[in-house]
Amino acid sequence: MKETKVVKFGGSSLADAKQFKKVAEIILDDPTRRFVVASAPGKRYVEDIKVTDMLYKCYEMASEGQNFDEQFQMIKDRYNNIIMDLGIEDF
């Protein structure tokens, strides 16, 4: 039976485009890594906010009936920056 690995990456290992590229190399270096679970990007620097924490904040604000558009835009911006820095154009 062919060995198959499930691997999970997230947090600082997916914090920015540079880290995404490192993760891609890790995955491609081992053909048994066939299933990849990606969680939310973490901090890029000490004062940064983890995406998970931003998502919790959106939930908290929504639960209290507050407008969370600005908070959600920060999450979208984080992912869009990663996409742009990876040079992905057709998204």
Language model features by range: what are they?
Residues 1-91:
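Nucleotide/pyrophosphate-binding catalytic subdomain
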